[in-house]
């Protein structure tokens, strides 16, 4: 294959999140090679780039030149073992076949309103799933879905979908998933939605749990790094990985009720009862407290709104290894 994938850290040469897409496009244009951001993982700091071998070499050289002038650390590295331009527009020709396969495999009945509405965050649009015309329009804003366009262009066609939850839900879900594999993973926006405060349009998630291997907590690490960005200052969201933090997730760990910052009370001496009598122990309050460990609240990936992350998983917010 003539394709590879690389990871780019534009903050190491002074390019921010708002300008990284423009930067990659400029290198593609100058080199005459294909380059595309396919994973937006961590604002300003981590992006996956799909491209031709020559295109990625040009990106590596240009970023190295900029790093030298800026004084940053190495900003580009190849991702080993990948020779397919995943999540790039080059895969769009495969969307119809993938859609047909999905349609054949999805259950005949899905409780779309109960299980997906306001719970599933597709990375294609980086917003909660809805059964509305406005949500369908969001899909059409990012991909040229002929099925969505046909439904939106004709009021009678849309009304036929709107009258049947199974028909409408299946249309939206198959389009979201089939187009996702040929579209970038918008994990930066998905995390901003999850961690953002409610008064600012976010979901206000209090506890975030990655379901994945404890020795490779990709999404948990991205979440923790995102929460350290200036725009999330003061956010107290707790991030877990189900393998790494099993005790917390399943409430099998124990915490002392005594704060580490507070001195423990000294237990009173145990008095020995006379022979033939019962022993009477006078214990300090700290000993009693230690005997009753505090329960740990069960984590919920989304606070009042439970969202299932993507893809980085693809298409589902959960979000996307690096999300995919």
Task: Annotate each PLM feature.
Residues 1, 26-36:
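Short amphipathic beta-strand starts and helix->beta connectors
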Residues 1-19, 204-249, 253, 257-258:
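FabD-like malonyl-/acyl-CoA
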Residues 12, 51-58:
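Helix N-cap motif at beta-to-alpha junctions
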Residues 19-25, 56-68:
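Short amphipathic alpha-helices in soluble, non-transmembrane regions
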Residues 36-42, 112-113:
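Short beta-strand
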Residues 45-50:
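A generic structural motif
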Residues 68-207, 216, 225-231, 259:
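Acyltransferase
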Residues 262-323:
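Long, low-complexity intrinsically disordered regions
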